[in-house]
């Protein structure tokens, strides 16, 4: 019997997906690398993919756009997403970003919300810097190396690549906000692929347990995918305790939007997260 295929779009392959792909019982994953969160939004609206792996804040922002407004986070695939604000040499503190062009994926949703909150906390006015859309993490690194912009948020291994090229670490999202959540799986509630996504969550849960119990096998899966051992170990360290999105992380995303006066500040956990697939397919209770 042929395996079912799930269509998923992401910036970089998440650890659990790489580990799950080694399991013969797993679904076939048709993965599509995207260059921006707008590509993810458009693909979900058009029904070209079944789910995306992305910043959970995107689900909040997308539900405020013209369109279906039925996006929900159905799982969380990492404990947190490590994000480093990388800048040109000589700009090693946030006050040095006044007047700077800062490269982002999108100006109103995603990881940019945490970035804006950090700048706000540092007392940098919203008219004292410019957010310049430059695409996903790889695209932002390429733009930074091409001397476009002054700073951007990067995750591993892209932050290390920027530092090796002469840029400096300016700030860490995790140091500012320890409860910052990892990437989530976002889908539309009206999607016909609900059962398919649920079956994929079963695959990811088996992978999560394997990472926890047999990290050496998880490391091998990552290295086999072409990533260095250091990247594998970093991913393994961020293995979540559960696929259920954390209430603390979601609350932080809402708090950031409230502090910044962004749409979605009146959201609550059920408006952002549909954890019923985790309950139905994995058996976890809230």
Each language-model region and where it sits:
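Short, surface-exposed recognition loops or helix-turn segments adjacent to catalytic cores
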Residues: 128-137
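Short, glycine-/small- and polar/acidic-enriched structural segments
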Residues: 2-124, 131, 150, 154-156, ...
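Secondary-structure end/capping motifs
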Residues: 193-264
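Pocket-lining segment of extracytoplasmic ligand-binding domains
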Residues: 138-222
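Conserved C-terminal helix/tail region of periplasmic/extracytoplasmic solute-binding proteins
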Residues: 262-286
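Structured segments of extracytoplasmic/periplasmic soluble domains
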Residues: 43, 62, 100, 118, ...
């Amino acid at each position: 019997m042929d395996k079912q295929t799930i269509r998923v779009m992401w910036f970089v392959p998440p650890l659990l997906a790489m580990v799950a792909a080694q399991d013969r019982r797993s679904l076939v994953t048709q993965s599509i690398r995207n260059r921006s969160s707008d590509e993810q939004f458009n693909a979900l609206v058009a029904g070209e993919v079944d789910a995306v792996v992305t910043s959970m804040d995107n689900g909040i922002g997308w539900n405020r756009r013209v369109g279906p407004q039925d996006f929900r986070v159905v799982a969380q695939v990492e404990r947190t997403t490590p994000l480093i604000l990388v800048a040109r040499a000589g700009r090693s503190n946030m006050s040095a970003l006044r007047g700077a062009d800062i490269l982002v994926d999108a100006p109103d949703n995603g990881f940019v919300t945490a970035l804006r909150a950090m700048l706000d906390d540092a007392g940098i006015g919203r008219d004292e810097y410019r957010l310049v859309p430059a695409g996903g993490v790889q695209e932002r690194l390429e733009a930074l190396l091409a001397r476009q912009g002054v700073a951007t948020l990067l995750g591993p291994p892209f932050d290390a690549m920027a530092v090796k090229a002469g840029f400096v670490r300016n700030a860490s999202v995790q140091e500012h906000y320890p409860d910052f959540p990892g990437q989530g799986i976002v889908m539309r509630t009206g999607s016909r692929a609900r059962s398919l996504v649920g079956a994929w969550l079963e695959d990811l849960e088996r992978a999560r347990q394997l990472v926890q119990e047999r990290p050496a096998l998880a490391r091998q899966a990552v290295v086999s995918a072409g990533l260095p051992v250091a990247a594998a170990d970093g991913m393994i360290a961020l293995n979540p305790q559960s696929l259920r999105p954390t209430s603390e992380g979601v609350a932080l995303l809402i708090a950031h939007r409230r502090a910044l006066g962004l749409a979605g500040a009146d959201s609550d956990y059920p408006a952002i997260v549909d954890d019923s697939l985790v309950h139905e397919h994995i058996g976890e209770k809230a």
